[in-house]
Amino acid sequence: QGFMVRKSLGVSSALELDGASVCVNTGTTTELNLADFFRANGMSYEPVVFEKADEVVAAYDAGRCDVHTTDKSGLAAQRTKTAQPDDHMVLPETISKEPLGPVTREGDEPWSDIVFWVLNALITADELGVSSSSVDSVKNDADATPEWKRILGVEGDTGAHLGLGKEWAYNAIKQVGNYGEMYERHVGMNTPLELARDGSL
């Protein structure tokens, strides 16, 4: 969770928001995190609360509050929908971490398992520096770890229990890249959302 402000407010840090009016959804953890952040930093604020998320966005865009707070990914998306996106910025501070990820339909366990394991393979590849451009060399490296040989389908058949071929993880990494590559391509700093990875995955 973070904060979005108009650049004209003249602040570059959430620690400069003492006395600000903040648009927020009522009855949410977002509202609780907001109160905790201001209290922990010895600052005051004026909550401007709404039941629905679109009401919060509309009120912020209409100038009814100085600040909008919600998940940073939501702020980035909502910034692109304002009348003048370049007039707004998401402040650098992350005041709470909200886990966001893929969801699947209840009752389709095979598909849920595939989504879970593919996501884990892409995150592992990112953590270990295996990208869409380097996955072939890792796969063909005789000195690759046994773990990578299994993941990439060189040894064993880890895809069988998922109903997939043995190169399922290799194919995913080769086709879409690791988690970091996907992140940068869809929501990273060179996209309209401009979400920095620092402090997230």
PLM feature segments, named:
Residues 11, 53-54:
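Structural motif corresponding to alpha-helix initiation and N-cap regions
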Residues 19-20, 41-45, 64-65:
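Loop/turn elements at helix/coil->beta-strand transitions in domains of secreted/extracellular proteins
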Residues 24, 42-53:
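Short beta-strand-to-loop elements that line the ligand-binding cleft
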Residues 33-40, 54, 59-90:
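A ligand-binding cleft/hinge motif common to bilobed small-molecule-binding domains
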Residues 154-201:
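C-terminal functional modules
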